[in-house]
């Protein structure tokens, strides 16, 4: 990975600084109701958004598909009741119904989040069909 890109991705964000200091996440920025992260707030008018993955996030779910690509190091995710460790090069795919959290990670543990509205997959559905297990998982 390009060193400049890595340094940019690895930098601790203001959001992460606040979480590390014990502050609560800014729910107005992320959630429409309860602990459900909202696509309209995070994706605005886009179908797909790529952003640095927050290294420490409490239990939540979302109304979009989340893909987490581990660019460097590793992170531990609790998905439902299952503990998953993803390592450099791994991709974690979470559907809209997944409730999960990310355990605290180090500065060198860098992941990229790819947030996708379910409507993005409409063209894919015409190819694979609606009665497939992948369709059930994604939507």
Where are these regions (language model features)?
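N-terminal regulatory/effector-sensing and dimerization cores
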Residues: 46-136
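Generic protein-terminus/edge-of-domain signal
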Residues: 1-74, 129-137
